[in-house]
Structures are given as structure tokens and as C-alpha cells.
Amino acid sequence: MRHRKSGRQLNRNSSHRQAMFRNMAGSLVRHEIIKTTLPKAKELRRVVEPLITLAKTDSVANRRLAFARTRDNEIVAKLFNELGPRFASRAGGYTRILKCGFRAGDNAPMAYIELVDRAASQAEVVAAE
């Protein structure tokens, strides 16, 4: 029985899943929009939104928590110097998921996940697979 088990397995073991979402969260923070499958985008939302909430209060302890979750000082710096102040007045819902059709090879549903207050001039999209 799978009572009270939240989250998707995505055909990966736990360490692979953790590493994948750590990498995807870093890519999303760095580029502010990535293209991935719809289930991965929905799960990534559960990883990124608490990181941005953490970044709204700048402290050494919060920076260490963010580093423990991302393992990248560049990502931590962007979270606390840019994204935290940008979303200071927003109480949640920092990401948006836009469906974008199906992948050619296996017909998997694809989606863009982006930060909501992203500058419109950034037209490039990074594929995260």
C-alpha cells in the first residue's frame, strides 16, 4: 500500500532523483526558464519554491541550508541577491508551468517551467533532460 507517500518516483532511485532535482533546480535558478517533461516540472516546483521562500530572509543559516540543498555557491548567491528581494512581496507561487506539446521521440508531454517575474527579454530556453 502506498498510503501517505507523496512525490513521484519517475523510474529512478532516491539518490538519482535527488541529484536530478538538485541539478534541475540549479538550472532553473540560473536560467529562470527550462524545458522538461510535465511530471518533472510538477515535481521540480516542490523543490524550487521552498528554496525561494528560504532566500527571502537573508541569514548565514539560511544560506547554509540553501547550499546544502543545491551544492552550488553561484546558485546560492543568485537566490539571496536577486530572487529573494524580487519575490519579497509575493507569498508563494514563484513558478509557472506552461505545457508545450509532446516530445518527438516518445510522445512524452513537455512543459516549460519558469519563474513568474522573469524578464520578457530572455528568449533562450535551456533543455533539462
UniProtKB/Swiss-Prot annotation:
Alphabetically, the GO molecular function entries are: structural constituent of ribosome
- Listed InterPro entries: Ribosomal_bL17 (IPR000456), Ribosomal_bL17_CS (IPR047859), Ribosomal_bL17_sf (IPR036373)
Signal sequence bounds: none
Q: So which domain of life are we looking at?
A: Bacteria
Q: Name one Pfam family in it.
A: Ribosomal_L17
Q: Which PROSITE patterns match?
A: RIBOSOMAL_L17 (PS01167)
Q: Which UniProt keywords apply?
A: Ribonucleoprotein, Ribosomal protein
Q: Which Gene Ontology terms describe the biological processes this protein takes part in?
A: translation
One GO location term (cellular component): cytosolic large ribosomal subunit
Query: HAMAP family from the xrefs?
Result: Ribosomal_bL17
Q: Which family does it belong to?
A: Belongs to the bacterial ribosomal protein bL17 family.
Quaternary structure, per UniProt, is: Part of the 50S ribosomal subunit. Contacts protein L32.
* Protein name from the UniProt record: Large ribosomal subunit protein bL17
Please name the source species: Yersinia enterocolitica serotype O:8 / biotype 1B (strain NCTC 13174 / 8081)
